[in-house]
Amino acid sequence: MIKSWWAEKSTSEKQIVAALAVLSLGVFCWLGVIKPIDTYIAEHQSHAQKIKKDIKWMQDQASTHGLLGHPALTQPIKNILLEEAKRENLAITLENGPDNTLTIHPVTAPLENVSRWLTTAQVTYGIVIEDLQFTLAGNEEITLRHLSFREQQ
């Protein structure tokens, strides 16, 4: 039956039917296979990115609240503290103290800058402030009399 139907068709009709069959197969493959797979991959990549973002946020929160240890320092604590002090426009001098500690020479600086510097040292690098002594030096300034640091154990 199909053979006789096909035999009755002219060459141009056979070409049109063959072209429509190929086109139909292409549309089926695109809409039935490729597009769903592409959508599936995009959704899962988006989900994976959200999970990575959530994990990073959780690690940051845990680190901020002291629930996770800090990564090992890649440079000496003295270099880190001096670099961060420079970012906060603090002119400080550090000396090596007893038991792997660092001490600061007395310096007068804006309270806000000192506060940011100490917060960065603690939160970002896990540097422990062992001793802090200061006096008020004027309008929103303090004089650091004594300050000693050590790396978190």
From Swiss-Prot:
GO terms for cellular component: plasma membrane; type II protein secretion system complex. Residues 1-16 are cytoplasmic. It comes from the Bacteria. Keywords: Cell inner membrane, Cell membrane, Membrane, Protein transport, Transmembrane, Transmembrane helix, Transport. Induction: Silenced by the DNA-binding protein H-NS under standard growth conditions. It is a single-pass membrane protein. Belongs to the GSP M family. Inner membrane component of the type II secretion system required for the energy-dependent secretion of extracellular factors such as proteases and toxins from the periplasm. Plays a role in the complex assembly and recruits GspL resulting in a stable complex in the inner membrane. Provides thus a link between the energy-providing GspE protein in the cytoplasm and the rest of the T2SS machinery. Part of a cryptic operon that encodes proteins involved in type II secretion machinery in other organisms, but is not expressed in strain K12. This is Putative type II secretion system protein M. It comes from Escherichia coli (strain K12).
